[in-house]
Structures are given as C-alpha cells and as structure tokens.
C-alpha cells in the first residue's frame, strides 16, 4: 500500500479489504514487484543495507512489531535505563507496533486503534518498563479530530456522507 492513495485503493479493492490490510495484525497487503520504484531496495535511504538485509516488499503490523520490539530493547530501553529522556518520531504503523509491544494490546484491539498524525504521545514507565501512564499531549477535541481523520483516510467519499 506504500505510495498508494488510500481512497483510490479503497475504491479499487473495497473498504473492507483495505481496512484489513491497513489495520489487521497479521494480514499483509500484496507485495510490491521487485522492479517497482517503491521497492525499498531501490530507495536511496536503504542503499546502505544492500547485500546485507533483504528488505520486505510487503509488511503487516506483526512484521513491524518484530522489527520495533528488538530495536526498543537494544537501542531505546538502555537509554531510558541511563535516565535519558527519549524522543521517538515514526510513521503511524511503527507507533502502532510500539504501542502494541509496550502496552500489550491484543491483536483485535490494535486493529481498531488509529494513531493521530503529528500528536505527541507520552509514556511514563515503571522501573520494570510496564506502562504507568500513556497519553497524547494537546487539546482533546483536536486530538479526537485527528484520530477521526486517520480513521476516515481509507473510506470512500460517498460512504462518509
């Protein structure tokens, strides 16, 4: 689904299928052809991995969790253990993966979670790294509107009315 217009994709495949691809935990969308310009192996930022890592041509949230969780454990958690504050900026799907991992959110619950774009999410963790408190920063009405906007991204125009 990378690089595709969400509304046009919903018109082509149907809202239910696009929602399944975008929000389910373990259903991958169709893979990109290897010669597709959107293939990460053809993108400049990923050239440093050429020959060392096979970059995926499709990914579901389960795959993202499998990448995010070890990164959190090896790179982020040690900094927090040293008392550092850590700022993470990421795509919504990576944030969903991190939330699932940190908050132990069920597969079904994560399917309905919409991450608002550009809204800071703050975690307060206990010493054992369980979540003490998590919440978005900002005006609740604006945050709700941003969550709703993300939810509506793959809904066809005529169904919004």
Where in this protein do the model-derived segments appear?
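Short alpha-helical linear motifs
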Residues: 46-47, 88, 160-161
């Amino acid at each position: 689904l990378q690089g595709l217009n969400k509304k046009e994709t919903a018109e082509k495949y149907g809202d239910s299928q696009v929602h399944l691809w975008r929000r389910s935990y373990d259903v991958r969308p169709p893979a990109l052809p290897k010669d597709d310009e959107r293939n990460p192996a053809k993108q400049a930022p990923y050239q440093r991995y050429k020959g060392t890592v096979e970059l995926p041509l499709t990914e579901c949230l389960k795959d993202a969790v499998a990448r995010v969780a070890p990164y959190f454990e090896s790179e982020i958690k040690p900094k927090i253990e040293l008392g550092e504050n850590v700022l993470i900026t990421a795509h919504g799907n990576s944030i969903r993966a991190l939330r699932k991992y940190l908050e132990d959110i069920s597969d079904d619950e994560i399917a309905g979670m919409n991450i608002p774009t550009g809204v800071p999410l703050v975690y307060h963790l206990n010493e054992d790294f369980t979540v003490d408190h998590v919440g978005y920063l900002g005006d609740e009405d604006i945050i709700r509107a941003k969550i709703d906007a993300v939810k509506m991204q793959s809904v066809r125009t005529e169904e919004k009315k």
